[in-house]
Amino acid sequence: MVLLHCIFAINSKTILCFLASKCSSFFSISRRVGLIMQSGKAIFVGNIKGGVGKSTLAVYLTDYLRERYATRSVMLLDTDPQGTAFEMMRPLSRADDIRFLPIGDRYDGVSMTTLDGILRRMLSQDESVTIVDTGAGKLGNVWQMAMLCSTVLVPTSMSWTDLRPTIDFIKELDDRKEDYGVVNPHVIVVPNRTSPSQKNFGQLAEALEEVNAIMAPPISDLSIARSHGRDFHGFDAVSGTRFSEEIKRLGEFIIDYVISGELDRIYQRA
């Protein structure tokens, strides 16, 4: 096991990130294309724990990336049966840039097949980006979709009641990857709903030593985003707020390490 310690300095705050990787090559799994060779990127937003802000991050990140990459295809796929992300983003999206494919505990062959086809098509498109929002709960029926994605984005609060199931969720992903001999999807944990004054993320960094994951820049002030939830007008509507700056910072982190392929290169060298 090779452990890489990465330090990201952001707005004079230093966040300790742990990136753990096995010294292995990229392999193919059943019905899976080698993601490192693909131009498109897919980001799976998930956590077994509910109420950690998955849909909020998914919609704001989608809207930020659409603004950042006006000429690229940025699609939102909402698989959460509640359909929150779909309802928020539908007024701001073209018909071909958003889909609602609810996948619950019961197997839905039509939705699964459709989702599989859309993901593979997007991954084959040059410079496309796909955000997949999911409901709370175990990977269940969507684990194959998670394994197709470049990255799993896992939001969590700093409370132990959220951290413990979050670590269990990542361990399940690690087990799946070990079973198939792959390192994708990379796991990025987002400290979410943190106190604006919080500077010490040692508790989360220590918890991540148990798993193969890195820590992204934190997000605070989600109360601002929630206040816009019922009347969602996109990233521009929260312009000038701390939340806006933090979403932008997270978006640039995703661009630098996921969309650019830098995480793929780091894992290749490990």
Language model feature labels by segment:
Residues 34-36, 42-52, 59-132, 136, ...:
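P-loop/Walker-type NTP enzyme "switch/lid" segment
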Residues 193-236:
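Beta-strand-loop-alpha "switch" segments that mediate conformational coupling across diverse proteins
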